[in-house]
Amino acid sequence: MGTKGKVIKCKAAIAWEAGKPLSIEEVEVAPPKAHEVRVQINAAGLCRSDTHVINPKFEGAFLPVILGHEGAGIVESVGPGVTNVKPGDKVIPLYIPHCKKCKFCLSPLTNFCEKFCKGKNPLIEQELMEDKTSRFTCKGKSIYHFFGISAFSQYTVVKDVNLAKIDDDANLERVCLIGCGFSTGYGAAINTAKVTPGSTCAVFGLGGVGLSAIMGCKTAGASRIIAIDINSDKFAKAKALGATDCLNPRELNKPVQDVIVEMTNGGVDFAIDCAGGSEVMKATVDCATVGWGSCTFVGVNLADKGLTISPIELILGRTLKGTNFGGWDAETVPKLVSDYKNGKFDLDALVTHTLPFDKINEALNLLDQGKSIRTVLIF
């Protein structure tokens, strides 16, 4: 008695209301339709973007919703027309689709797809499948998808263009982090900023994304990597991953960007903002050297009005770049998994807690209290 073509009943964490704990519920997961895949999630990381959507300050959220966008699992069944994966394959769901047909997918300049970011905020897109319906039901009510993934469910349904097939021997409890946090930070340094050997770098924010950016800077051969965070407890981990200096803005007697400029004789070659917020964005620009300083922005801060910048700061030679998912896509993610298996980088260092899925609210509390970098939930 297989499950193919049948509704599956399983456990999922549902956000019914903003500002309230998630609720573990039994949900019904419909079979995949054309060009859809039903995936059994084995492990999922908890990312700050998941908490943004249930913050009362967030505008436009679709509720109730099953969150989670950093997961890994095994294909349970496929719908008609699916050719890129088959039942039994290990996969990482990706919140950026890769249709391979649109002008974005065909361009070497971006990892975007026309199916992604059609509006102003990707966090509230892909909330339904292509036919504008959900595959989740709970207590007779339709439940929204999140980012096209909804990894906080034992089973989920995603579009075939939102999947990367990975090696059969991949450790799902670690490579799930490649679904967002690690790839976003590491790629911001490697792919977007294009950090060069011998360069100086500043990384703002030492969560999972920021620490991954430090790993990227180190891999690229940076000679000096300055890590900045208001939580000094994160400095030991940052140094273990490659940071040469650590600064806490709250412990300085002048703006952190001024300190960085003094430390580096005029500013860093590459500045990467993994925290977000107008103050951090301004510091990112100000700490970059004139002439060629590169500023890459990754972090998002809720309800922040963003950066106000003078043309003078730009005509002095600085460049500003934005990045999403570190420039990776469904074709390049499998290479990241292979690089992890071959020891090119250490995903283990990012995992501070491993908890059973039903402890998800405990994991959220650890994140809010700044006590975790990445918590991996095991299903």
UniProtKB/Swiss-Prot annotation:
It catalyses: a primary alcohol + NAD(+) = an aldehyde + NADH + H(+); a secondary alcohol + NAD(+) = a ketone + NADH + H(+). Belongs to the zinc-containing alcohol dehydrogenase family. Class-II subfamily. Disulfide bonds: none annotated. Signal peptide: none annotated. SUPFAM superfamilies: GroES-like (SSF50129), NAD(P)-binding Rossmann-fold domains (SSF51735). GO terms for cellular component: cytosol. The gene is ADH2-1. GO terms for molecular function: alcohol dehydrogenase (NAD+) activity; S-(hydroxymethyl)glutathione dehydrogenase [NAD(P)+] activity; zinc ion binding. The keyword Lipoprotein does not apply. Keywords: Cytoplasm, Metal-binding, NAD, Oxidoreductase, Zinc. This is Alcohol dehydrogenase class-2 isozyme 1. It is found in: Cytoplasm. Zn(2+) 2 binds at C99, C102, C105, C113. Its main location: cytoplasm. Binds 2 Zn(2+) ions per subunit. NAD(+) binds at G205, L206, G207, G208, V209, G210, D229, K234, V298, G299, V300, R374. Its cofactor is Zn(2+). InterPro entries: ADH-like_C, ADH-like_N, ADH_Zn_CS, GroES-like_sf, NAD(P)-bd_dom_sf, PKS_ER. Gene3D superfamilies: Medium-chain alcohol dehydrogenases, catalytic domain, NAD(P)-binding Rossmann-like Domain. Homodimer. It comes from the Eukaryota.
